[in-house]
């Protein structure tokens, strides 16, 4: 098995410059498709990887940071700063809406107001490790009443 960069090859070049997210098993597959097709995000979805399907939350938290991805979930446990210290993350986005369409509306706002607000131009694959993540070291809980303000570190 090679390195992650060598295994992804050309795909990594296609999605560089796009928001890079790590989506846990609590997020519906339809929403993952929306992230990829409508928002053009670079998505690692744990349910598509047998070795990650049953990993504990702490492992997902660690892997998201190691892979330089913002963790996206519907699991509010990630908001517990004692269990998941913000400074040890690449950023956490916790979503909540009663229906999937509401989640899509929230993701469009997050894409526009948070992830792409200060977006850098397309980044070379080798520079991904040096590019700061939009929510690095912070957590954001978005829901239908979200006023657009970020949760401070």
What are these regions (language model features)?
Residues 42-57:
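Conserved BB-loop
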Residues 68-83:
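Acidic, metal-binding active-site segment of PIN/NYN-like and related structure-specific nucleases
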Residues 17-21, 65-70:
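Short active-site oxyanion
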Residues 2-14, 19, 24-25, 29-40, ...:
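Acidic, PIN/NYN-like endoribonuclease modules and their adjacent C-terminal/linker elements
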Residues 55-69, 124:
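Acidic, metal-associated active-site segment
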Residues 24, 44-47, 72-75:
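Short, conserved beta-strand edge motifs with alternating hydrophobic and charged residues
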Residues 40-41, 69:
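Short aromatic/hydrophobic-glycine micro-motifs
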């Amino acid at each position: 098995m090679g390195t992650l960069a060598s295994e992804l090859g050309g795909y990594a070049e296609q999605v560089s410059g796009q928001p890079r997210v790590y989506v846990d098993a609590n997020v519906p597959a339809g929403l993952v498709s929306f992230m990829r097709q409508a928002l053009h995000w670079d998505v690692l979805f744990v349910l598509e990887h047998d070795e990650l399907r049953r990993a504990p939350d702490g492992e997902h938290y660690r892997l998201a940071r190691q892979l330089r991805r913002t963790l996206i979930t519907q699991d509010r446990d990630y908001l517990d700063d004692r269990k998941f210290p913000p400074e040890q993350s690449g950023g956490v986005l916790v979503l909540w809406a009663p229906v999937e369409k509401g989640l899509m509306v929230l993701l469009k706002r997050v894409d526009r107001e948070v992830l792409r607000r200060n977006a850098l131009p397309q980044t070379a694959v080798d520079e991904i490790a040096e590019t700061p993540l939009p929510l690095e070291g912070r957590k954001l809980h978005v829901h239908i009443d979200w006023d657009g303000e970020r949760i401070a570190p």
